[in-house]
C-alpha cells in the first residue's frame, strides 16, 4: 500500500499522461472522492457526474487503478464491542435452552448475573450511547421471557450507525422544540396585541364615562365657587371704576363751582364725596403696602396635599456633567460678587479687532475648487436674522424637496422601488414620510417605516416631524431604538434604527403592517443596512404593493439602482449655495493643533458665520474644546466671543441641543463634532467647515477575533459630504487640512462597507432565525469575507445555537429573541441553570453601556481612582460592575451618589433601562428569575458558559489566548491588573496601543470542561509548568572533559 505522499505523487504523474496537466488540489480531490466511494463503479459514476473528464479509454483505466490503490479503513470490531456481542450471544443461547422445570431459578440467576456483568461493561462505554443500549437490553430480555425456543435474532447494528441514529433523533427533537417555541412566541405576541387593543378600547370608554361623570359633578360643585370668584373680580373692577368716576366728578365740580357760593346741603354732599375718595385711596394704599410687606417677610411652607414632587437630583438628571448644579450656584455667587468696570453702553459700541496670531502660527490655505450651488449667493445671516422665528410651514416650503413634491409622489406611485438622491438638508428624511402620510399611504391601519443608521438621528428626526405635524411624540409619530420604544398603537410614522427593523422581521417576516419602507442614509453602508437590502428585495418580490424607498446623500446611487433590478433614480438638488474648497500648501504634522489654530485664524479674519470642525472621537473633541477655551481665555477681550460646543453620541441630551440654539449677537459658534454631523444632523448657520481628513473606523480580524477602532483617512465621499455642510444658508468655505495631491491620490473613493470589517455573529443568527440557511448565496450588496462568515458559524455552533447541519437549535432561537450579542445571550440563558439570572441581567446591562461607567476628571484623578478601587471585589471586573449597580440601586438610583463616586449617572440610567427590557424578555424566552444570594461562583460559571470562547492563561511570557495562542494584556483599568491570575475570561479584545483584554474575570480551568466539553479537551487545559521536572545537576565544561 502506497503512502499518502507517494499516492499523491503517483496521481499527479498519471494526470500528466491523461489530462496533460497536473495540480495538487485536483489530485487531492480525486483521492478524497475515491476514499468515500464503496465501489469502483461508484467512483467512475461520480467522476462522470462532474462533466470534466471523458471517462473512456485511459481515463477509465486510471480511475479503476486509483480506486484500487486508495487505502481504506478496515472495519475492525473493538474489543469491548466484541466482548459485549459474545455476552449477548451467550445470554440469548442460555435463554433458548430449557431442559428441566427445576432449573428456572438457576437460569434466572444466570441471566441476572450476566445482565449485571453486561451493565458493568456498559458503564465504561461512552455516556452518549448509554440510553439506547439499555433500551436494546430491555427488548432482548422481554424476548427471552416470551420465547422458550427459537433461533437467535440479529439485532446488532454497527456503532457508527447507532451513533448517527441517536444524533438524528436528538436533532429532530430539537427542531420540534424550536418550532414549538417559535409558535408559542408568535401566539403570545398575537394574544398580547389583541388584548392590548381590546383593553385600550374598553379603557378609553371607561375613561370617557368617568370624565363625563366627573365633569357633571365638578360643574355642580364649582358653580357656586365660580360665582363668588366672579363677584369678587367684578367688585374689584367696579371699585376702580367708581373711584375713577368719583374723582372725575369732584374735579368737574371744583372746576365749575369753585368760585360759586354753595348751599349748606351742597357743601355737605361735596364734603361727603371727598371723604369717600380719601378713604378709598387710603384703602388702596394699605393694600399695596400689605402686598409689599408680604413679599419681604418669611412665610412657613404650606403643606402640599397633592402628589409629592420628584427629588431635585432626579429633576436635574440631564444637567450635563455631575455637579452641574453646584457649579452653576458657584458661578452665580462669583458673578454677583465680582466688580465690573467699563461704560454701560460698551456693548452697543462696535468692537474693533485685529489679527492676534503670529505670522508663523498661521496656516496657509490655497483655494482649489468650488462646489457650485443652485441659488444666488446672499448676505450671510446676521444675528438678528438668526433670531427671527419663521413658521414651520414656511420652513417646509423653503426646503429643496418641496418643489418636487408632486413629481416625487407620482414616481413613488408608478414604481415599487425608487432610489432617491439628495444631499443632507434637502428634506428627504423629514418631508417624504409626511408627503406619503398626506397622500393616504397610512390608511387602513398601514404604517410607514423610515430607518436611520444612528440612534441620535432617529430620535431627533422623529421629534422634528412630530413638531411639524403638530402631534405629540409617541402618538402618530414615534421612534424605536435599541432598548427604547417611543411608539403607541396610533403610530403610523415610525423612525427606527435599521437594526430594529431587522428585529421586526422575526415577528413579521413579510412586513405586512407596513405600506412603505424607507431606508435612509443608505450611503453609510452600515452592517444592518446591507442586510436590510437583501431582505427587503425579497419581500418586495413577494408583496407587489409594498413601496421601497432608498435614500442616499451621495452620487453613488448607480450601485443601489443595479442591485434593485435597475430601479429608477429620483434626484433632488440639495446644495443651495456655492462652497469654496481650500487645501493646505504642505501636510500638517499634528492635525489637532492645526484645527485649533485654524479655528482662531478663521475667527479673527473671516466674516460672521459659524464654524463646524470634524474630529474622530470623544477624546479628541474634548481635547480640542479645552485647547480652544484655554486660548480664548488667554486672549481675553482681544477677540470676539467664541462659543465652543461639542457634539458626540455619549453627550447628554441638553448639551446636544445647545448646538441648535441661535448664536448670540456679536459672537461666533464653533461646533466640534464627529462624523455624525456629516449626514445625520443639519446645523443651521454653518458657513465654515474645517476638515482634518480623518475618521474612526472599526475593523475586525477573523483569525484572532479582535476588533480595533483605528483612526484612518476618510474617503472622498465623506470629504465631499463634509464640504457640503458649508453651503446650507449662504456661500461657504471648506478648509481641508491636507493637500490637494493627498485628496486625489491618498483617499479612497468610498468608505469600506461595515459588513466587510465587523463580526457577523448577530447577523448570521438573525438570518438563520428568518429561515435563510444558504448564507453563501444570500443576496448581499457586497458579500462579507469568507473567513468572517465561517468564524461566525463556528462560534454559533460552539455556543449551541446551531447543530452539526447548520440548522438553528432551540437555544439559538431563544438567543435570537434577545437584542444583545450571541455570547451575552448564551450567558443569560445559562443563568437559569446556575440560578443567578438576577445578577446576570445586571452584568449584561452594565456590559451594554460601552465602558462608560466611571469617569476621571483631570483635576480629581486621585479621588476618582480611589473611588473606583472601593468597588473592587475578588473575582474580576464583571463583579465590580455588579457591585456598582447594586450599591446604586440601594441608594435609590440617586444622581448625587453617582457624583460622589465618580460614576456617570447617564450611563447608569441607561443600564437600568437595558436591564428592565432584558428582564421583560426573560418571560418571552421562558427563563425564570432567580438570585444566587451572594454566591458569586455561580455568577462566574454562568458568564463562563457564554464567554468560554474568550479565554486566556498566564504563561512565562505573559497572557496568551487558549486557542489562538495570541499574546494579550490586561487593561490597566482592570481590577485584576496587578493580581495576574492563572486563568482569565475577557469580554472583548481591543487593539489600541496593545492587544488589551477589557472586562476580565478570573476563572478555573475545570469550569471550561464543565460548560464546554465539546470545545475544550482536557489536554488543552493542562498547565505545562505545573508538572514536576526531574532533578538533575548540570556538569561544567571541565567535568565533561
From Swiss-Prot:
A motif (DEAH box) lies at residues 520-523. It is found in: Nucleus; Nucleus, Nucleoplasm; Cytoplasm. Residues 409-573 form the Helicase ATP-binding domain. The modification Phosphothreonine is found at residue 712. It is an enzyme of class 3 (hydrolase). Expressed in the spleen, thyroid and testis. Also expressed in the brain and cerebellum. One of its GO terms (cellular component) is spliceosomal complex. Residues 598-771 form the Helicase C-terminal domain. Changing residue 724 to N: Dominant-negative mutant. Impairs pre-mRNA splicing activity. Fails to interact with any of viral RNA forms. InterPro entries: DEAD-box_helicase_OB_fold, DEAD/DEAH_box_helicase_dom, DNA/RNA_helicase_DEAH_CS, HA2_WH, Helicase-assoc_dom, Helicase_ATP-bd, Helicase_C-like, P-loop_NTPase. Belongs to the DEAD box helicase family. DEAH subfamily. DDX16/PRP8 sub-subfamily. It is linked to Neuromuscular oculoauditory syndrome: An autosomal dominant neuromuscular disorder characterized by variable features including myopathy, neuropathy, hypotonia, joint contractures, growth delay, chorioretinal lacunae, sensorineuronal deafness, agenesis of the corpus callosum, and seizures. Required for pre-mRNA splicing as a component of the spliceosome. Contributes to pre-mRNA splicing after spliceosome formation and prior to the first transesterification reaction. As a component of the minor spliceosome, involved in the splicing of U12-type introns in pre-mRNAs. Also plays a role in innate antiviral response by acting as a pattern recognition receptor sensing splicing signals in viral RNA. This is Pre-mRNA-splicing factor ATP-dependent RNA helicase DHX16. It comes from Homo sapiens. The gene is DHX16.
Amino acid at each position: 500500500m502506497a503512502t499518502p505522499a507517494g499516492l499523491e505523487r503517483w496521481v499527479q504523474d498519471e494526470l500528466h499522461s491523461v489530462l496533460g496537466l497536473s495540480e495538487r488540489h485536483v489530485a487531492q480531490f480525486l483521492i478524497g472522492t475515491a476514499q468515500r466511494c464503496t465501489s469502483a463503479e461508484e467512483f467512475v459514476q461520480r467522476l462522470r457526474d462532474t462533466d470534466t473528464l471523458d471517462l473512456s479509454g485511459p481515463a477509465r483505466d486510471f480511475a479503476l487503478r486509483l480506486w484500487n490503490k486508495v487505502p481504506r479503513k478496515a472495519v475492525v470490531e473493538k474489543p469491548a464491542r466484541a466482548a459485549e456481542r459474545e455476552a449477548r450471544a451467550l445470554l440469548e443461547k442460555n435463554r433458548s435452552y430449557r431442559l428441566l422445570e427445576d432449573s428456572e431459578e438457576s437460569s434466572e440467576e444466570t441471566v441476572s448475573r450476566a445482565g449485571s456483568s453486561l451493565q458493568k461493561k456498559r458503564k465504561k462505554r461512552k455516556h452518549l450511547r448509554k440510553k439506547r443500549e439499555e433500551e436494546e437490553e430491555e427488548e432482548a430480555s422481554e424476548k427471552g421471557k416470551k420465547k422458550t425456543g427459537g433461533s437467535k435474532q440479529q439485532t446488532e447494528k454497527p456503532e457508527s450507525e447507532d451513533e448517527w441514529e441517536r444524533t438524528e433523533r436528538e436533532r429532530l427533537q430539537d427542531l420540534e422544540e424550536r418550532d414549538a417555541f417559535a409558535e408559542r412566541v408568535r401566539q403570545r405576541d398575537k394574544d398580547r396585541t389583541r388584548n392590548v387593543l381590546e383593553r385600550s378600547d374598553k379603557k378609553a370608554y371607561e375613561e370617557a364615562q368617568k370624565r363625563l361623570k366627573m365633569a357633571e359633578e365638578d360643574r355642580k360643585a364649582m358653580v357656586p365657587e365660580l360665582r363668588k370668584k366672579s363677584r369678587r373680580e367684578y367688585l374689584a373692577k367696579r371699585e376702580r371704576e367708581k373711584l375713577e368716576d368719583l374723582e372725575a366728578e369732584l374735579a368737574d365740580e371744583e372746576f365749575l363751582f369753585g368760585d360759586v357760593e354753595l348751599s349748606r346741603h351742597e357743601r355737605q354732599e361735596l364734603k361727603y364725596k371727598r371723604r369717600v375718595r380719601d378713604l378709598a385711596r387710603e384703602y388702596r394704599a394699605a393694600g399695596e403696602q400689605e402686598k409689599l410687606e408680604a413679599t419681604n417677610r418669611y412665610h412657613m411652607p404650606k403643606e402640599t396635599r397633592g402628589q409629592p414632587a420628584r427629588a431635585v437630583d432626579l429633576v436635574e438628571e440631564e444637567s450635563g456633567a455631575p455637579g452641574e448644579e453646584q457649579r452653576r450656584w458657584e458661578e452665580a455667587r462669583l458673578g454677583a460678587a465680582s466688580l465690573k468696570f467699563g461704560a454701560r453702553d460698551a456693548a452697543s459700541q462696535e468692537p474693533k479687532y485685529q489679527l492676534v496670531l503670529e505670522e508663523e502660527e498661521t496656516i496657509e490655505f490655497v483655494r482649489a475648487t468650488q462646489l457650485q450651488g443652485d441659488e444666488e449667493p446672499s448676505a450671510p445671516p446676521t444675528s438678528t436674522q438668526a433670531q427671527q422665528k419663521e413658521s414651520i410651514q414656511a420652513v417646509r416650503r423653503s426646503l429643496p424637496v418641496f418643489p418636487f413634491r408632486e413629481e416625487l409622489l407620482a414616481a413613488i406611485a408608478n414604481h415599487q422601488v425608487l432610489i432617491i438622491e439628495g444631499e443632507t438638508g434637502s428634506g428627504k428624511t423629514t418631508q417624504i414620510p409626511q408627503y406619503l402620510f398626506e397622500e393616504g399611504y397610512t390608511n387602513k391601519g398601514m404604517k410607514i417605516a423610515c430607518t436611520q443608521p444612528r440612534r441620535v438621528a432617529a430620535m431627533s428626526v422623529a421629534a422634528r416631524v412630530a413638531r411639524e405635524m403638530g402631534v405629540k411624540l409617541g402618538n402618530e409619530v414615534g421612534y424605536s431604538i435599541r432598548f427604547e420604544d417611543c411608539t403607541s398603537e396610533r403610530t403610523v410614522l415610525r423612525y427606527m434604527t435599521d437594526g430594529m427593523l431587522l428585529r421586526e422581521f422575526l415577528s413579521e417576516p413579510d412586513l405586512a403592517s407596513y405600506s412603505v419602507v424607507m431606508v435612509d442614509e443608505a450611503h453609510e453602508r452600515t452592517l444592518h443596512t446591507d442586510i436590510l437590502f437583501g431582505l427587503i428585495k425579497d419581500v418586495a418580490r413577494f408583496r407587489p404593493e409594498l413601496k421601497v424607498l432608498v435614500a442616499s446623500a451621495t452620487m453613488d446611487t448607480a450601485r443601489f439602482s443595479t442591485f434593485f433590478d435597475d430601479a429608477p433614480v429620483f434626484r433632488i438638488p440639495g446644495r443651495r449655495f456655492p462652497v469654496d474648497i481650500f487645501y493646505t500648501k504642505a501636510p500638517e504634522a499634528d492635525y489637532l493643533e492645526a484645527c485649533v489654530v485654524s479655528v482662531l485664524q478663521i475667527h479673527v479674519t473671516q466674516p460672521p458665520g459659524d464654524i463646524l470642525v470634524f474630529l474622530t472621537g470623544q477624546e479628541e473633541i474634548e481635547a480640542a474644546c479645552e485647547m480652544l477655551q484655554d486660548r480664548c481665555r488667554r486672549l481675553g477681550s482681544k477677540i470676539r466671543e467664541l462659543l465652543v460646543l461639542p457634539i458626540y453620541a455619549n453627550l447628554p441630551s441638553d448639551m446636544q441641543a445647545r448646538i441648535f440654539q441661535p448664536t448670540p449677537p456679536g459672537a461666533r459658534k464653533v461646533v466640534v463634532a464627529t462624523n455624525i454631523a456629516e449626514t445625520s444632523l443639519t446645523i443651521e448657520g454653518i458657513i465654515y467647515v474645517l476638515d482634518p481628513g480623518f475618521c474612526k473606523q472599526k475593523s475586525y480580524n477573523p483569525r484572532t477575533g479582535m476588533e480595533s477602532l483605528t483612526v484612518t483617512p476618510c474617503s472622498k465621499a465623506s470629504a465631499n459630504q463634509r464640504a457640503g455642510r458649508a453651503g446650507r444658508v449662504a456661500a461657504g468655505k471648506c478648509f481641508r487640512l491636507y493637500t490637494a495631491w493627498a485628496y486625489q491620490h491618498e483617499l479612497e473613493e468610498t468608505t469600506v462597507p461595515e459588513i466587510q470589517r465587523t463580526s457577523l455573529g448577530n447577523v448570521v443568527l438573525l438570518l438563520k432565525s428568518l429561515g435563510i440557511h444558504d448564507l453563501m448565496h444570500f443576496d448581499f450588496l457586497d458579500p462579507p469575507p469568507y473567513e468572517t462568515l465561517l468564524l461566525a458559524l463556528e462560534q454559533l455552533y460552539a455556543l449551541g445555537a446551531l447543530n452539526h447541519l447548520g440548522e438553528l437549535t432551540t437555544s439559538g432561537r431563544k438567543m435570537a429573541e434577545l437584542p444583545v450579542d450571541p455570547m451575552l445571550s448564551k450567558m443569560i440563558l445559562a443563568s437559569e441553570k446556575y440560578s443567578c439570572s438576577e445578577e446576570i441581567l445586571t452584568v449584561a446591562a452594565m456590559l451594554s453601556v460601552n465602558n462608560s461607567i466611571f469617569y476621571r476628571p483631570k483635576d480629581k484623578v486621585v479621588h476618582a481612582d480611589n473611588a473606583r478601587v472601593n468597588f473592587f471585589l475578588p473575582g474580576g471586573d464583571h463583579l465590580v460592575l455588579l457591585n456598582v449597580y447594586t450599591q446604586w440601586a440601594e441608594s435609590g438610583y440617586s444622581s448625587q451618589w453617582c457624583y460622589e463616586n465618580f460614576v456617570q449617572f447617564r450611563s447608569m440610567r441607561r443600564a437600568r433601562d437595558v436591564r428592565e427590557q432584558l428582564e421583560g424578555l426573560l418571560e418571552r424566552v421562558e427563563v425564570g428569575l432567580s438570585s444566587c444570594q451572594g454566591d458569586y461562583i455561580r455568577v462566574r460559571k454562568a458568564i463562563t458558559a457564554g464567554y468560554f470562547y474568550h479565554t486566556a492563561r498566564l504563561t512565562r511570557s505573559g497572557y496568551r489566548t487558549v486557542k489562538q495562542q495570541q499574546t494579550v494584556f490586561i487593561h490597566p483599568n482592570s481590577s485584576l491588573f496587578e493580581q495576574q491570575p492563572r486563568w482569565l475570561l475577557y469580554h472583548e479584545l481591543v487593539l489600541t496601543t496593545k492587544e488589551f483584554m477589557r472586562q476580565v474575570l478570573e476563572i478555573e480551568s475545570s469550569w471550561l470542561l464543565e460548560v464546554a466539553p465539546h470545545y475544550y479537551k482536557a489536554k488543552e487545559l493542562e498547565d505545562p509548568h505545573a508538572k514536576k521536572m526531574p532533578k538533575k545537576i548540570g556538569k561544567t565544561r571541565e567535568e565533561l572533559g
